[in-house]
Amino acid sequence: MIGRKKQLDTALEKQNLREAIEHGEISLGEAVRRMRKISGMNQKAFARKIVGVSPRVLAEIELGRANPTVETLNKIGRAFGYEVGFRHK
């Protein structure tokens, strides 16, 4: 039962994240932070296993103080079905 609830919670968190991104209501850094949290990883694990950067670089991205490459952003978003691109404002 607990496993099913966690799956539902994760699905809801992903839905809320997707809506926030689609409506432009969330910064890049906050989106990355929420993706990491939804994945259940700390910064160190997410940085090394998913993104392939140092934890410090990931922290800077989450704080909005980094200028990540498109490749890095695609690595972050890939697990959530996102890729970097332009959208009409």
Please annotate each region the language model reported.
Residues 71-87:
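DNA major-groove recognition helix of helix-turn-helix/homeodomain DNA-binding modules
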Residues 37:
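Short helix-to-coil "ATP-lid" hinge immediately C-terminal to the conserved N-box Asn in the Bergerat
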Residues 1-30, 34:
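N-terminal flexible/basic segments that precede or flank functional cores
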Residues 40-59:
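Short alpha-helical DNA-recognition segment
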Residues 31, 42-43, 69-72:
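Residues that mark the N-terminal boundary/hinge immediately upstream of a DNA-recognition element
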